């Protein structure tokens, strides 16, 4: 069974179609890149999968279920916005996640913090942007979820932090789960992807294995993306 399936899915805001008749399936055990320019529909699709938006037409299924309380138990979501309360420490955030999510693996989170040299007692308000993004990612990847939805996980951080974030994603996701990474920084994430989806103006242009693109097109995913989306 696909971990995520869209069937003729559309989402409109007024007269604007953010997603237009999207059909796709994502299988477990894959790291998938959701790639497209700004405003292409990436965040809308992720919010629909997380139950933050409802479809205008069609349907979206997570592990065979419509998004709701049951699917939230198997989906771990990283927003493209910072959401950590300033007054909380990393330890308090782990306490909250441990109370709220049955699948939160505190030992895994503590190991990642130790590896980075991050202080559990540090308050969010004293953290740099890069540190806050690392803490958010650690919390999300420390859940033993079936589907990880990561919206721009490497946006706005330095190259060394990007490398750490990608390494953290690969090291810590359940191989029976799927990871959907939304980004426009293709060259940075290409190394970790099994599959890519190209999206533009709310429509799916392509869904393909990364190896197939390299073999059939004779170019990297980043090069092919630039070719497809060139002005």
Residue positions per predicted region:
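Catalytic Walker B motif of ABC-type/P-loop ATPase nucleotide-binding domains
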Residues: 148-152, 157
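The feature captures the beta-strand-to-loop junction immediately N-terminal to the Walker
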Residues: 35-37
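Conserved ABC transporter NBD signature motif
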Residues: 57-71
């Amino acid at each position: 069974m696909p971990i995520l399936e869209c069937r003729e899915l559309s989402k409109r805001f007024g007269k604007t179609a953010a997603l237009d008749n999207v059909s796709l399936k994502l299988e477990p055990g894959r790291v998938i890149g959701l790639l497209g320019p700004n405003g292409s529909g990436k965040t809308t699709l992720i919010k629909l999968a997380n139950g933050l938006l409802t479809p205008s037409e069609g349907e979206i299924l997570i592990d065979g279920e419509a998004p709701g309380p049951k699917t939230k138990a198997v989906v771990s979501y990283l927003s493209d916005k910072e959401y950590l309360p300033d007054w909380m420490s990393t330890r308090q955030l782990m306490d909250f996640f441990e109370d709220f999510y049955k699948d939160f693996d505190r030992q895994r989170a503590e190991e990642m913090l130790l590896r980075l040299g991050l202080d559990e007692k540090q308050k969010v308000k004293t953290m740099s942007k890069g540190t806050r993004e690392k803490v958010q990612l650690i919390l999300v990847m420390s859940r033993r979820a079936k589907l990880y939805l990561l919206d721009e996980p490497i946006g706005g951080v330095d190259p060394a932090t990007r490398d750490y974030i990608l390494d953290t994603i690969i090291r810590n996701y359940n191989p029976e789960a799927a990871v959907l990474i939304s980004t426009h920084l293709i060259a940075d994430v290409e190394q970790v992807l099994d599959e890519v989806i190209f999206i533009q103006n709310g429509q799916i242009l392509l869904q393909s294995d990364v190896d197939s693109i390299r073999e059939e097109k004779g170019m990297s995913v980043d090069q092919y993306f630039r070719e497809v989306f060139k002005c």
